[in-house]
UniProtKB/Swiss-Prot annotation:
Keywords in alphabetical order: ATP-binding, Ligase, Magnesium, Manganese, Metal-binding, Nucleotide-binding, Protein biosynthesis
HAMAP family given in the database record: RimK
GO BP term, example: translation
EC number(s) per entry: 6.3.2.-
ATP-grasp domain ranges (all copies): 104-287
Enzyme class: ligase
Gene behind the chain: rimK
Entry's family note: Belongs to the RimK family.
Binding locations of Mn(2+) 2: E260, N262
GO CC, one annotated term: cytoplasm
Full protein name: Probable alpha-L-glutamate ligase
Amino acid sequence: MKIAILSTDPSLYSTRKLLEAGEQRGHEVYVIDYLRCYMKITSMKTEVIYMGKSLKGFDAIIPRIGASKTFYGTAVVRQFEMMGVFTANPSLAISRSRDKLHCLQLLAREGIELPVTSFAHFTKDINSLINTVGGAPLVIKLLEGSQGIGVVLAETYQVAKSVIEAFSGLNANFLVQEFIEEAGGADVRCFVVGDRVIAAIKRQGTEGEFRSNLHQGGTAKKIKLTPQERSIAMRSAKAIGLKVAGVDLLRSDHGPVVMEVNSSPGLEGIETATGVDVSGKIIEFLEKNLGKGPLGDRL
């Protein structure tokens, strides 16, 4: 196969591992900076142009789109889709996953358990907004945040009120969410490829830190999922339309609840903690869907 990894930085662990996995299986793999691509859109011919040359003959792409570059990145993915190129994650699914509110709405529609969440534009009645999620302590999240940035734990009503007023004053869109205290600053990352959960880790925040993101200094260890956790992870990825996804769960007193569905989950933390060749599993997924196995299988 001829595969393009859409990434702005070829030195990133995830990008390097995907490149190595593809090449080890005999495929022709390129790292393409999607921000340097431009698109030719006509009724006669659709093209993606990179460094002055039309990108032709690709069988598949693996999008690794940065959160702050979602609009342009998904436009490039969509252009490849129009050219008939298979994508590990569809452009629409990536867009859904990046819109935290839309993502939660889609999950709720499928009956998937979530923390009680509230979203509002008119914030004069802050007391009612806070009470909607059960009062303080509660979590306030910027819709545009990622990797734990823009997430605040408000432990008292007064702190919650102050943060909401500050975000409102900045015209920022934010969610107010129930705080799952019993999770103890830990979450579960389930890595979904195709229709399977191939690996899972428990991420624990540093002492005094409720955010468990590895980017915030958290630690990770391999865990075994319950059948319920495995099912909810697969259902969540399917609800958003993702084929490669990191589904983040919290273990609450009433069962697992979904916090987020990530369309470009990092590979380093989960591969290091579990020993699972996640990169190779993603390449195998492309092979399965395109009917083109490793080069050795075709010689």
